[in-house]
């Protein structure tokens, strides 16, 4: 977290709620439970949703992909409920899954009462929790960007135009999404995401007095992050030397980092990053590929920021 203010205050999220709705839809899509070209039949209940909508009719059929577009671009309440019913049988059952997922993500300030964000007693979350679900969505389901970055589009073969409620998509460099919301009681909210130079930031603004103000505040937060922080790739200070293997078909094994390491640091602090390599001595065959041989400890100005396992890059059999 680069900056926060009243981040744990429980407030109404309005349609920013739909980030969780989208997360559950994307999880179902990416796990193969449903497909983008599945056709969904709209119920009378879904068609009767008030607020922002795409005027779905009872019995109308629309693909999962089109409904996703309706939810991300124009925040269609009717589309959100149609998808909730398609996935879970009823909105109530879907909301139970939303709350379960919120618990799993550590969203302690959150209670969902519906999948749309329409005003309801006890339907609350915090800026902190919105950031958590936003991160989960963009990190693990990057294809959501295909929808959240749409500025203008249409459905029903061009008969119904869609323009994104998120102005940043059109007017902020690197904007990738994510979701706006507004009601009379929640006022104006947004979870805004943007990426520059491989670094993606999330800015959450709640209870802003005007629509323009929420975008200005989100822009200021993102600008602050991009101006002051950078993502630094970390490599070992010295090359990883081969490790001796006793009784092996080869005398050595080459160690490698198990994963890449990137650290978020203040600009100008890149020089304060250092690494310490801890490697096993006297390794005895057999050695499995991927077997842990040690670790690289990464510090910034003496403070440990990450520990990356070091593993064997190949298998070494035992001499027979």
Locations of regions flagged by a protein language model:
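Active-site-adjacent loops and short helices of periplasmic peptidoglycan-processing enzymes
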Residues: 1-141
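Domain-terminus/edge residues, biased toward the C-terminal soluble/receptor-binding domains
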Residues: 107-111, 119-124, 128-320
């Amino acid at each position: 977290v680069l900056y926060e203010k009243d981040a744990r205050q429980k407030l109404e999220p309005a349609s920013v709620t739909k980030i969780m709705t989208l997360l559950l839809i994307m999880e179902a899509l990416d796990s193969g439970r449903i497909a983008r070209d599945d056709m969904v039949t709209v119920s009378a209940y879904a068609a009767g949703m008030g607020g922002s909508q795409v005027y779905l009719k009872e019995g109308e059929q629309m693909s999962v992909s089109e409904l996703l577009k309706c939810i991300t671009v124009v925040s269609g309440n009717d589309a959100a409920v149609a998808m909730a019913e398609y996935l879970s049988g009823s909105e109530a059952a879907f909301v139970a899954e939303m709350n379960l997922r919120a618990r799993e993500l550590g969203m302690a300030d959150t209670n969902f009462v519906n999948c749309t964000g329409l005003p309801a007693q006890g339907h609350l979350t915090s800026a902190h929790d919105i950031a958590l679900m936003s991160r989960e969505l963009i990190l693990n389901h990057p294809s959501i960007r295909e929808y959240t970055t749409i500025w203008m589009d249409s459905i029903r073969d061009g008969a119904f135009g869609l323009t994104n409620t998120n102005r940043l998509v059109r007017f902020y460099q690197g904007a990738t999404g994510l979701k706006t919301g507004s009601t009379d009681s929640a006022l104006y909210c947004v979870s805004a995401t943007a990426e520059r130079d491989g670094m993606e930031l999330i800015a959450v603004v709640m209870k802003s007095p005007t629509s323009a103000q929420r975008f200005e505040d989100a822009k200021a937060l993102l600008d602050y992050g991009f101006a002051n922080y950078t993502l630094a790739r970390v490599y070992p200070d010295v090359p990883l030397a081969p490790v001796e293997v006793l009784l092996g078909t080869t005398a050595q094994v080459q160690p490698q980092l198990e994963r890449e390491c990137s650290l978020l640091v203040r600009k100008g602090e890149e020089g304060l990053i250092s690494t310490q390599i801890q490697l096993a001595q006297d390794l005895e065959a057999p050695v499995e590929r991927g077997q842990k041989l040690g670790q690289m400890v990464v510090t910034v100005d003496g403070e440990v920021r990450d520990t990356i396992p070091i593993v064997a890059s190949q298998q070494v059999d035992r001499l027979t």
